[in-house]
Each structure stands twice: as structure tokens, then as C-alpha cells.
Amino acid sequence: KHIAIDGKTICAASNNRLNHEDPEEGKLHIISAWVREDGISLGQVKSDEKSNEITAIPKMLETLDIKGATVTIDAMGCQVDIAATIVNQGAVYVLALKKNQPNLYESVEEYFKWARTEPIEKKQLKEFSYEEHEHGRHIYRKVEVCNDVSWIETVREWKQLSSIICVTRKGEREGHQT
């Protein structure tokens, strides 16, 4: 099963929002675990702020039976401890990597730049691409998969890290790039 974990700020809800000078302060932020195939929520936890997802996600994971699942989380959840928690509970993870992990991000970015210049017979990347139309846009996606992660200096910190995936998305709507 695929369990997607994501945080959302509920804009119309607040914790006594009228008493705050900053309109962003006091908004309700919820972390949810969603089973994609079944369309059901496994659970939700309140987070004081979006930045607190890093501490809220492990607490929620402790309450869930995720054994045998693939758990996906956006870049906020791309943390060594969260990856270890998922693996320790018998699941596998797919975590989005962005610049909140600057050293790992830079290593991955440099690797893909290098790998793309290698001759096809030496390439360590598997490549897939597809196009689709959605919401009035023409979308092109290229997916590159590297199953050799030995080049990552911090690979031992990331429990059972086995692949790095790069997704490049280009969109066009009415002749304009999106």
C-alpha cells in the first residue's frame, strides 16, 4: 500500500486568530496520512506551525501500522530520523529532496549533471519519459533513476537508501511555459 503523508494549513481555521497581529499566526496546521489505494485517512496530527512537521511526522508514524507500505513525504519530511523510523517499522520510503538538505541536494544535483554527460553505454541512469494532458496543460515528465548510491557521502546516515530519482517536469498552457 502507498501511504502519503502531507501537511496542510487550514486557512479558514485558526487558534484564536483574531488575537494575533500576524494573520499567518494561529492558523491550524494538520499532518495527514492517506492511503492512496483506498482513499482513506489513517490519521491526523495537529502541528503548531508548518516548520514543526519535522517533529509531528515521527509522532504520527509511531501510531500507525505501516509495515509493508511505501511511505511518501514531501521535502519537509526528508530527514534522516524520519527515514529510519519508517524503515524500523517495516516500510520503505520515497522522500522528496529539496534544498532543506543542502549537502545532499548539492551532491545529487552534481551527480545527475555528471551522469547526463556520460556515454549511453556507461550511464548508470535508467530514464523514462512521458507526456500527458491535464487541467488544460500539456505536461512532459522525464524520470531518471540511479540505483547506485555509493557515491553519496552520507549514504550510511540514510537507512536503507537504495535509489535516487530525479523528476524533471515541463508544462505548457496556451503556448506559455509553466
Which stretches of residues belong to each language-model region?
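Detector for Asparagine
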Residues: 15-19, 52, 88, 100-103, ...
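Short hydrophobic alpha-helical runs that function as membrane-insertion/retention elements
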Residues: 92-97
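Short, surface-exposed basic-aromatic patches at helix termini and helix-loop junctions that form
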Residues: 83-91
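Short, hinge-like loop/turn segments at secondary-structure boundaries
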Residues: 21-22, 89, 110-114
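Conserved, well-structured functional cores that handle cations and Mg-NTP chemistry
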Residues: 1-73, 78-81
